[in-house]
């Protein structure tokens, strides 16, 4: 009989949910994926499957809406590859066109590990909580059933977080 991953057990026990006296409990969050910026999704997916057995990858060109980048309307398109890797997903991201937070990352670091994806059950509240801590939304958008926002916490944690909330498509 297999057990739930440790992070899932901890979330069920309330670990990771902060509570201050007189304040409502924070929303539930858990790591869902690791995002990697790549030059070519198909090639990166092939190599990961061939070299270390992660895959198969599902390749998508999501149709995003209400895009923002640096607080302004955004116009960009990406191709992504998704595969299970144990309890989390690997998300490969290839820029097809437009200006994104991935561009500045590539200019500074080259291709590679970019962000931690964090699933939340209330993205609006999660974003408000992060903004109250001084973090800002760098890029955001949605598609049917999913809303997402990238927050830069690079100076404080060395990481970029992608908060996302998945709802049943209406």
Q: Where are the language model's segments positioned?
A:
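Amphipathic alpha-helical segments
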Residues: 42-54, 126-132
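Helix N-cap motif at beta-to-alpha junctions
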Residues: 38-42, 120-123
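Short, structured motif recognition centered on aromatic/hydrophobic residues
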Residues: 31-38, 48, 80, 85, ...
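Vicinal oxygen chelate
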Residues: 2-27, 36, 55-86, 92-114, 124-170, ...
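Onset of an N-terminal alpha helix
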Residues: 27-28, 41
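Short, solvent-exposed interaction modules
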Residues: 106-128, 132
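The feature marks the first
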Residues: 21, 31-33, 39, 53-54
């Amino acid at each position: 009989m297999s057990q739930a991953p440790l992070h899932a057990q901890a979330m069920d026990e309330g670990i990771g949910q902060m509570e201050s006296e007189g304040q409502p409990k924070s929303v539930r969050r858990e790591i869902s994926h690791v995002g990697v910026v790549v030059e070519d999704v198909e090639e990166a997916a092939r190599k990961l499957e061939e070299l270390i057995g992660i895959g198969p990858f599902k390749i998508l060109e999501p149709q995003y809406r209400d895009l923002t980048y640096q607080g302004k309307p955004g116009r960009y398109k990406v191709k992504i590859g998704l595969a299970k890797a144990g309890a989390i997903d690997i998300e490969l991201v290839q820029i097809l066109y437009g200006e994104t937070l991935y561009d500045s990352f590539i200019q500074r670091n080259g291709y590679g590990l970019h962000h931690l994806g964090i699933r939340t059950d209330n993205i609006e509240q999660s974003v408000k909580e992060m903004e109250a801590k001084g973090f800002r939304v760098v890029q955001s958008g949605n598609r049917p059933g999913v809303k997402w926002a990238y927050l830069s916490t690079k100076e404080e944690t060395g990481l970029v977080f992608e908060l996302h909330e998945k709802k049943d498509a209406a």
